[in-house]
Amino acid sequence: MKKVVIAGGGQAASSVAAKLRSEGFDGSIAIICKENHPPYQRPPLSKKYLLGEMTLDRLYLRPLSYYDDQNITLHLGKTVDQIDRAKKQVLFVGENLEYDDLVLALGSQPRRLPEKIGGSLGKVFTVRDLTDVDALAPEFTRDKRVLIIGGGYIGLEAAAVAAQRGLKVTLVEMADRILQRVAALQTSDYFRHLHTTHGVEIKEGVSLARLTGHEGTVTGAELSDGTLIEIDFAIVGVGIFPVTDIASDAGLSISDGITVNAFGQTSDPSIWAAGDCCAFPYRGGELRLESVPHAIDQAELVAQNIMGASLSYFPKPWFWSDQYDVKLQITGLNTGFDNVITRSTNETSISFWYY
């Protein structure tokens, strides 16, 4: 009986397992997940879950009963420590599992502030998993002062929730504009206006110099323009990096993530990767995407290829973000355009077309 082991517990991991079963795979499937929860949705963490509008059970991608019904073994609260490619085994907490095919769906981790500028102070939060958000949620009480470092999706979504909860929000973005890495100027302008009308103070072209604290807890911040502000807590949203350590330790090829070919195979043909953690061929170069649709699409392709399909992956980049009562949807990449067309059918809908 063929054995598939999946390292990781997010959207890609769940999608590989589900697609294998739906395609008729009758071998064993095991998912090794470092969290104590089955695979769950991450996007709502900084939106509806943080607002208290979504319960934990609704976060789960599939109920626990699904894994039992589909004969998928979950190893929760476990982390893969080592891959033995010669023996085709993964080792974790004194156990080992043999595999015929191993899928690395390791995801990514948030970048943290260096300790020397206050990154280790208490009440300095990231927003990546349930543990992060469960620790952060009690801070969201009216009139508290929060500094948000980073003007990407996570920072802006957290700012929206904080403003809706009546907090005093300052957001700093070291680039010239918010959303600079992921969206064009017109989109940045729209969301800057949206946030400022909700009372968020946005400082662009300004970075954090250092956080200050008292008795180990953050109490203030010094910005690069010399501004000093008093705060009750801080949220760091300065990007993520792919988890590649166990792949690197196993001698697999690493670039901006775990390197895979068009089929999703790593430099070891019996080891595959999908989602945030891997970089794949794209138009003569290499690309790594951080989005739920990509994680699902690539994971399902990997599952089909494990079963012999030999399909090549070509992404359909699609991203979304919910802020206040506005939904941002982006299709395509923020590169290689010369012209922008603005279209608006009513006061609540606007679109920007880049070509």
Show where each model-derived region lies:
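Rossmann-like NAD(P)H-binding beta-loop-alpha module
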Residues: 135-183, 218
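A short alpha-helix-loop-beta-strand transition element characteristic
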Residues: 28, 56-59, 255-257, 309-318
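FAD-binding core/adjacent interface of flavoenzyme oxidoreductases
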Residues: 1-7, 60-147, 222-224, 235-237, ...
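Catalytic nucleophile loop
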Residues: 10-13, 152-155, 303
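Beta1-alpha1 glycine-rich phosphate/pyrophosphate-binding loop at the start
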Residues: 2-73, 161-182
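FAD-site-proximal beta/loop scaffold in flavoenzymes
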Residues: 120-141, 214-222, 227-304
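Mid-to-C-terminal Rossmann-like scaffold of FAD/NAD(P)H-dependent oxidoreductases
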Residues: 2-3, 22, 277-355
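A Rossmann-like FAD-binding core segment of flavoenzymes
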Residues: 26, 74-91, 97, 165-262
